[in-house]
Amino acid sequence: MRSEFFRHLRAGLAAIILAGTASQAGAAPAHGIAMYGAPALPPDFVSLPYANPDAPRGGAVVTGNVGGFDSLNPFILRGNPPWQLADLTHETLMGRSWDEPFTLYGLLAESVETDDDRRWVEFTLRPEARFSDGTPVTIEDVLWSYETLGTTGHPRYRGFWTKVDSIAQTGPRSLRLTFTEDDRELALLAGLRPILQKSQWEGRDITEAGIDDIPLGTGPYVVSDYEINRHVTLKRNPDYWGRDLPLRRGTNNFDEIRIEFYGDDTVLKEAFKAGLVSYVREFNAEAWATQYDFPAVARGEITLSEIPHGKPSGMTGFVMNTRRPPLDDWRVRDALITAFNFEYINDTLTGGRQPRITSYFSGSELGMDHGPATGRVRDLLTPLADTLPPGTLEGYSLPVGDGTARNRTALRRAVDLLNEAGWQVQNGRLVNAEGTPLSLTVLLQQDGLIAQASAMMDIYARALERLGITLKVEMTDKAQYAEREAQFDFDLTMMRRSLSLSPGNEQTYYWGADYADQPGSRNLMGMKSPAAEAMIRAMLTARDRAEFVAATRALDRVLMAGRYVIPIHQYSVGRIAHKSQLKYPDDRLPIYGDGIGFLPEVWWFEANE
């Protein structure tokens, strides 16, 4: 990107030019912006539809994380911060409503303006916006935050920055970004960059900051205490500037949020049963049905809440690293998927209670139709036919086992695929033409899913052993896992990729070729697919919802036929066991369910009578 000198030179010149062109093509400043259509909430909305504006404030909540932490800076690649920090302590120009596919309303910004093609976007800051130390948020803070995060921050911020042509101050409280390409989502993404305080980091390198260098934010909470790998305590800022904003009414109700760290999920759940933790999420339907009958539940001290949602299934499963042979061969990956006896595993571990994920966007209108591609989906994919994985156009579905432990038919099919790929069994071991045996290692993190994932791998390893394949399981703590995942140091690993009702630029970060070899990226499988790139481009340039849906369904086909992940269960409902004093608006749940912005944001504490 450009040097800071030239960026600020351009900012100054652009301010003069734009002042004279503000009346050119573009809508009037608005209170919100939607990816398609208009925002659902009017300019005078009182609160988010899933928040209780009359919720009482006070009390404390204790949540538990598995693993540890060695950083309190969630904006750089270095270190492992608690995942909750960014959303609770920092803010962006716009805030999201989680009851709409993708709509933003003013947070640090009081208004947003863009042109019909969305080649630029302009924000006007609220004059009352303040950092936690009481200093005002300035345009200089915003300009510095965008450039710093885009150039030296965590890789997740860099993709957006490469599409920014210019960023310029246009008035005392306003700035404009122009973009290098036709990508209608960029105007919304521009409103979702965290804003840091420039003066805190003057003369210092934010990427080299120690744990005591906690970034100042504008959010409702501040870090008040911590002990590395033990706990972090957040206190609600009594002088929080935005507490009366419509976007904030009925949210951030707890006086204190304490994050406790535990060695594994079993210890965390025992701490919950002992009353040391306020709530836990349960991802195993069998455990939910059979392990939550302890005395505190019977006494009414613990409530079991199920939170439905309307978002896509996303992808949860074991991702295969195609950077490493022989996982770069789709036939080997297909064989490994075929040998995974989901039906038997599901019945054994969950009592058959959790259906399997059938595609990345399954459970929503964005999910691919099964069978041959038709209509606009086929039109989008056909020009790329020579690059498509087998089954993309014809139709690909996950293999279905017979439900028995031996699963003979599926294993015979797996053998055929491995033979086609040049692997043969010799002396009980599957070897290639050079006589090298096939041995794989699955890397697992000691987190809330470790027990279930480990049990799955035990069953899977026995099936692969019958094929002559050795599968080893390696478990690491959070810090080790994060380092190895960032360097793609695994054959297989657990992947849980949540997907929204309005997928966009993040899809490039998940599946784009430019990120396949970039340390720390989310493209864990290392895929480099021209078809995936083209479908993402079609999504980003779609002018209407129908074209967007067709492009997303086409991308779904490319991802599934690529055979990159061994899918496991859907999580069609959130399961939360919590202290009965913790309440939420159960009559107005957001379409994204128990996701970002739900717990603890819209919950509150209500003392027992």
What annotation goes with each model-predicted range?
Residues A28-D116, T124, W144-E147, L216:
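N-terminal lobe/hinge region of extracytoplasmic solute-binding protein
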Residues F45, R281, P390-L499, V573:
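Ligand/substrate-recognition segments at binding pockets and active sites
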Residues R126, A209, G242-Y292, D334, ...:
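Ligand-site clamp/hinge motif
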Residues L108-E110, S132, V137, T178-Q197, ...:
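Aromatic-rich, solvent-exposed beta-strand/loop patch
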Residues S166-A168, S224-K235, E260-R324, R331, ...:
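Extracellular/periplasmic solute-recognition and catalytic clefts
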Residues H90-F102, E147, G191-R258, G263-V267, ...:
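Gly/Pro-rich hinge or "lid" segments in bacterial periplasmic/extracellular proteins
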Residues R158-E202, T218-E227, P372-L384:
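Surface-exposed binding/hinge segments that line
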Residues G32, N65, P81, L88, ...:
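Detector for C-terminal structural segments
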